[in-house]
Amino acid sequence: FPDLSPRADDERKPAPLTRAASLQAALGTFEKHMQDEGFSLNTVKAFASDIRLLGRYLGIGTPIGEIGTKNLTDFLHWLTDERGVPCSPKSYARRVTALKVFFGWLHDTGVLAQDPSTAVVQQSVSSPLPSAPTAVDLERALVVAEARRAGADGHKPDARPTLLLNLLLQTGIKKGEAMAIVPNHIDASDASAPMLYIRYANPRLRYKERKLPLEPEWLRVLDEYMQQYRPSDTLFTCTARNLEYVLRDIAEAGDLPVGALSFENLRWASAMRDWRAGVEQDDIRQKLGLSKIAWRETKSKLQKLIDHEATTMA
């Protein structure tokens, strides 16, 4: 390692932000803050773009301490009525969120005595509620999968439907994460408490890596699957589309509604199971691999799904 003198080391450290810092200088520090906090890559890019747009309106060299609530309100009015570029309700809502996160961070870290974004009104944007299979749907699906596993009706025994369905319900992982699993990501050293490690090759996505518990019975299904398919690389030897077909076939055989089983729907079903079981909300967030920003909307939708389910069952 190079022998850096204290002076040389100090020169490498960015100067602390003050209220006199420019919007551009604050944005650079804000981007690093978002990365350190585990914001998703898309969120970092979107929020940075939104703050640059504010800089385009106010002037990128504007001192952050001179930006008030009226400046932000005027900026939002410019976005919707004067800029000449369409601003959808969803984009508008995200930009308001970007302002609140940016100036809230400046206030929380003591750079600004007051948060000018506090009084900015966040307009709600209605987005469709996701669908998730009901408990009855899942029971039917699991019965079908177990029948396939046992080789019922003269079919060749196939453990893959049971393996896939239970994997998604127990972990809530995404399709891409499922496709990236290799057998050594599964820790079966303690058969009573097996674990799945979700890995990412991209260093910028390492914050999404996590360890997820699996039920012991799943290991027995895994053993059958490994004997039947003998994967040489990734756990699933087929394409993602083929796995989607597996889920679709289970749904059809179980007489479930069209589209009831998908990677996305089962991810919601997994989160709902944890929510009903009283799992801590931050534990659910981490299980799903979501940033704190992304969790806000997901949490709201989960609550609505649970409420809708309760109303339907009443």
Language-model features: where?
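N-terminal core-binding DNA-recognition domain of tyrosine recombinases/integrases
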Residues: E11-R12, G28-N42, A48-L129, A150
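Basic, Lys/Arg- and aromatic-enriched nucleic-acid-binding interface segment
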Residues: L142-K175
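Short, basic (Lys/Arg/His-rich) helix/loop patches that form interaction surfaces
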Residues: A150-G151, S232, R248-Q286, L290, ...
